[in-house]
Amino acid sequence: MSLIYMNVMMAFTMSLTGLLMYRSHLMSALLCMEGMMLSLFILAALTILNSHFTLANMAPIILLVFAACEAAIGLALLVMISNTYGTDYVQNLNLLQC
């Protein structure tokens, strides 16, 4: 396994560890999820470039689109929670149930 793949996998692992450890604020959870999606995008792009599989060239772009949608929904939820409750604690998400 090359050094680049190990660095990307380590970045994903560190983002996942950050997501599991810092669960109190929504902003830190969103940043950790963005780090995970970015490392997945880089890993998918490197894998497709190294395997010369031309039919799957759109897969990293589709992953990037899903990451952008996830970020937009997360930021909208963050703005709604911070305007309603004044804080961005994850525990306030339980209060949003209908």
Curated annotation (Swiss-Prot):
One of its GO terms (molecular function) is NADH dehydrogenase (ubiquinone) activity. Belongs to the complex I subunit 4L family. The gene is MT-ND4L. Pfam families: Oxidored_q2. Keywords: Electron transport, Membrane, Mitochondrion, Mitochondrion inner membrane, NAD, Respiratory chain, Translocase, Transmembrane, Transmembrane helix, Transport, Ubiquinone. It is an enzyme of class 7 (translocase). Its main location: mitochondrion. Core subunit of the mitochondrial membrane respiratory chain NADH dehydrogenase (Complex I) which catalyzes electron transfer from NADH through the respiratory chain, using ubiquinone as an electron acceptor. Part of the enzyme membrane arm which is embedded in the lipid bilayer and involved in proton translocation. It catalyses: a ubiquinone + NADH + 5 H(+)(in) = a ubiquinol + NAD(+) + 4 H(+)(out). One of its GO terms (cellular component) is mitochondrial inner membrane. The chain crosses the membrane at residues 1-21, 29-49, 61-81. The lineage of its organism: Eukaryota, Metazoa, Chordata, Craniata, Vertebrata. Disulfide bonds: none annotated. PANTHER family: NADH-UBIQUINONE OXIDOREDUCTASE CHAIN 4L (PTHR11434:SF0), NADH-UBIQUINONE OXIDOREDUCTASE SUBUNIT ND4L (PTHR11434). It comes from the Eukaryota. Core subunit of respiratory chain NADH dehydrogenase (Complex I) which is composed of 45 different subunits. It is found in: Mitochondrion inner membrane. Its EC number is 7.1.1.2. InterPro entries: NADH_UbQ_OxRdtase_chain4L/K, NUOK/Mnh_C1-like. It is a multi-pass membrane protein. This is NADH-ubiquinone oxidoreductase chain 4L. GO terms for biological process: ATP synthesis coupled electron transport.
